[in-house]
């Protein structure tokens, strides 16, 4: 006889335990912060810093190994910044775009490659920092601050004339556009990474060995694309704030 207890004990119904929003909280200065996000973020920063120090500790005229990879990544980010911002101003923004790209890229891949679920926490579980909306909103707000700074630094208060160009009645639309940019950046990245991890988790629970492997490879690809999209849009917004409007 099929009883409620039988249904609840069925492994298929364990899929319902896949949930969003469970966190391991730290109390810092009377404020609760997501401890698991900070832990994995520190891991991501350690990987990036460790890679940079190791790859550039013994530079050779003919690069090989990690130095070769480091120079390839640097050239890639320089080209991205040059394309989006323009040849005149791009150099000063390479470090910012490089930091954004590497942090998002390594964060996304850490969620796909590192078995965080094996590390037990009092509550919640470790995951990619970009799996938390607070992280993606923070990155988007940093991008917003960057393109406002870029425009004001180059044009002074004249930067704000763009809101009434080419006609004053466009002011509300232009202001709204600047508010929607960080929203679209943050929710696009958060939604894609969260969806990828949830789908992978469900399929691993259903078919642990075969089906998840190609899906995980696809997840690595989409994670890299999301890092590229985020940094490309950040560069495009900065370039837009720097260009002359006539």
From Swiss-Prot:
Question: Do you know which InterPro entries this protein is assigned to?
Answer: ATP_syn_F0_a_bact/chloroplast, ATP_synth_F0_asu, ATP_synth_F0_asu_AS, F0_ATP_A_sf
CDD domains linked: ATP-synt_Fo_a_6
Per the record, membrane topology reads: Multi-pass membrane protein
The record's keywords, sorted A to Z, are: ATP synthesis, CF(0), Chloroplast, Hydrogen ion transport, Ion transport, Membrane, Plastid, Thylakoid, Transmembrane, Transmembrane helix, Transport
Where this protein primarily resides, as one coarse class?
Answer: plastid
Pfam families named in the record: ATP-synt_A
Query: Any idea which GO molecular function terms this record carries?
Result: proton-transporting ATP synthase activity, rotational mechanism
Q: Establish whether keyword ATP-binding is in the entry.
A: no
The answer to whether the entry has keyword Ion transport is yes
Gene Ontology, cellular component aspect: chloroplast thylakoid membrane; plasma membrane; proton-transporting ATP synthase complex
The record's HAMAP family line, in alphabetical order, gives: ATP_synth_a_bact (MF_01393)
Role noted for this protein: Key component of the proton channel; it plays a direct role in the translocation of protons across the membrane.
As for family, the record states:
Belongs to the ATPase A chain family.
What protein name is recorded for this chain?
Answer: ATP synthase subunit a, chloroplastic
Upper lineage ranks? Eukaryota, Viridiplantae, Chlorophyta, Ulvophyceae, Oltmannsiellopsidales
What gene is behind this protein?
atpI
């Amino acid at each position: 006889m099929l009883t409620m207890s039988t249904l609840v004990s069925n492994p298929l119904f364990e899929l319902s335990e896949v949930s969003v929003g469970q966190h391991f909280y730290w109390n810092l200065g009377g404020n609760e912060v997501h401890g698991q996000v900070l832990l994995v973020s520190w891991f991501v920063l350690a990987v990036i810093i460790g890679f940079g120090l190791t790859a550039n500790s013994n530079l050779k005229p003919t690069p090989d190994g990690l130095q070769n990879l480091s120079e390839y990544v640097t050239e890639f980010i320089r080209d991205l910044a040059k394309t989006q911002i323009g040849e005149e101003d791009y150099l000063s923004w390479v470090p910012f775009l490089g930091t954004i790209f590497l942090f998002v890229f390594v964060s996304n891949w850490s969620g796909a490659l590192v078995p965080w679920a094996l590390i037990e926490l009092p509550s919640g579980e470790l995951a990619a920092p970009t799996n938390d909306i607070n992280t993606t909103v923070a990155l988007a707000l940093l991008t917003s601050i960057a393109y406002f700074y870029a425009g004001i630094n180059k044009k002074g208060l004249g930067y704000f004339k763009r809101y009434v160009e080419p006609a004053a009645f466009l002011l509300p639309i232009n202001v709204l556009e600047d508010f929607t940019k960080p929203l679209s950046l943050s929710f696009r990245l958060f939604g894609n990474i969260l969806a990828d991890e949830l789908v992978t988790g469900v399929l691993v629970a259903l078919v642990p060995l075969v089906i998840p492997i190609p899906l995980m490879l696809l997840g690595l690809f989409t994670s890299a694309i999301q890092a590229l999209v985020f940094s490309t849009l950040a560069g495009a917004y900065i370039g837009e704030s720097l260009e002359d409007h006539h």
